[in-house]
């Protein structure tokens, strides 16, 4: 197969592992930056054309057809990356994950709405309009409170407000910059630990526990969190699979937290990193992803 990965940083561990796995299984993979693409719609066939310009000095060229596309772009490239995905979808190419699912996952509030609508437990959460006074929301959420920007990743834009007035001050400061924030209950009993599940299709292929270090409440590996192996029950795995399906994703990193009320879904990541979970679990996740693409790209082509 001829595969395309949409990625701005081809040297990243995850991108290199996926390219190695594809090559090992006899496939060719190109890695291209979606921000170097331009898209053309035409009434005459071919209706969907994608051109690529390597740099400001080079001449754009028309991209050839691919059997499958893997989106691995970050939050700053979501809009253009998903537009490129939509163009490939228009051409009938199998995309892992779809553009709509990617957009769902990148919007934290919409993700929570979709999860709760599907009956999946999430922390109590609030989102308020720009004209709502921050003080008015305080009685409706726990203290301490977690504050999150709507489009952050890797723990960036996540703040713990220890006291109600601290939450008010932080929200009012962000409001001045037109950045919306959601509020969530702080799950104190979980301490500084959460669980990452790697879901492919209808299977949890790997899990790990992440533990924040040196008083850091965020357990994200990018924030220095320590990882260790963890075994989940079938019921807990099923929640991760259901969360992935609720967002519409084929492949996802699902973040879970154990609370007094049971397991809660914190977030569903459309482009989860491979490095720490592969090293912690010892599982070749990259090969599992390529296997999934082989099957589904073939089904899509029939």
From Swiss-Prot:
Binding site for Mn(2+) 2: 267, 269
Transmembrane intervals: none
Entry binding sites for Mg(2+) 2: 267, 269
Domain ATP-grasp: start-end pairs: 112-294
Cross-referenced InterPro entries: ATP-grasp (IPR011761), ATP-grasp_RimK-type (IPR013651), ATP_grasp_subdomain_1 (IPR013815), RimK (IPR023533), Rimk_N (IPR041107), Rp_bS6_RimK/Lys_biosynth_LsyX (IPR004666)
One Pfam assignment: RimK
Record's keyword terms, sorted: ATP-binding, Ligase, Magnesium, Manganese, Metal-binding, Nucleotide-binding, Protein biosynthesis
Domain of life: Bacteria
Residues the record lists as binding Mn(2+) 1: 255, 267
Coiled coil: none
UniProt keyword Manganese present: yes
Any GO molecular function: ribosomal S6-glutamic acid ligase activity
Cofactor comment text: Binds 2 magnesium or manganese ions per subunit.
Binding-site residues for ATP, renumbered to this chain: 148, 185-186, 194, 218-220
Manganese recorded as keyword: yes
Cofactor(s) the record lists: Mg(2+); Mn(2+)
Gene Ontology CC: cytoplasm
EC number: 6.3.2.-
One record GO biological process: SOS response
Residues that, per the record, bind Mg(2+) 1: 255, 267
PANTHER family: RIBOSOMAL PROTEIN BS6--L-GLUTAMATE LIGASE, RIBOSOMAL PROTEIN S6 MODIFICATION PROTEIN
Family assignment from sequence similarity: Belongs to the RimK family.
Protein name: Probable alpha-L-glutamate ligase
Native organism: Haemophilus influenzae (strain ATCC 51907 / DSM 11121 / KW20 / Rd)
Gene from which this protein is expressed: rimK
């Amino acid at each position: 197969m001829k595969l395309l990965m949409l990625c701005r940083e081809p040297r990243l561990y995850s991108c290199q592992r996926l390219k190695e796995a594809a090559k090992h299984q006899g496939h060719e993979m190109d890695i291209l930056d979606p921000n170097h693409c331009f898209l053309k719609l035409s009434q005459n066939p071919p209706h969907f054309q994608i051109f690529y310009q390597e740099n400001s000095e080079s001449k754009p060229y028309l991209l050839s057809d691919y059997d499958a596309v893997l989106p691995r772009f970050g939050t700053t490239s979501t809009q253009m990356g998903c537009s490129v995905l939509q163009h490939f979808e228009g051409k009938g190419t199998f995309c892992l994950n779809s553009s709509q699912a990617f957009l769902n996952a990148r919007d934290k509030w919409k993700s929570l709405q979709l999860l709760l609508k599907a009956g999946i437990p999430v922390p109590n959460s609030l989102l308020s309009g720009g004209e709502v006074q921050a003080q008015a929301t305080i009685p409706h959420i726990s203290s301490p409170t977690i504050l999150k920007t709507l489009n952050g990743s890797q723990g960036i834009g996540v703040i713990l407000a220890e006291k109600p007035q601290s939450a008010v001050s932080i929200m009012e400061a962000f409001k001045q910059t037109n950045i919306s924030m959601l509020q969530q209950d702080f799950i104190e009993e979980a301490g500084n630990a959460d669980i990452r599940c790697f879901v492919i299709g209808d299977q949890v292929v790997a899990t790990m526990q992440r533990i924040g270090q040196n008083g850091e409440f965020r357990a994200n590996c990018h924030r220095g969190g320590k990882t260790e192996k963890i075994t989940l029950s079938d019921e807990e795995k099923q929640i991760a699979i259901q969360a992935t399906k609720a967002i519409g994703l084929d492949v996802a990193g699902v973040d879970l937290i154990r609370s007094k009320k049971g397991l809660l879904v914190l977030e569903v990541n459309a482009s989860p990193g491979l490095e720490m979970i592969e090293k912690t679990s010892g599982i070749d996740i990259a090969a599992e992803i390529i296997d999934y693409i082989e099957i589904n790209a073939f089904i899509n082509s029939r």
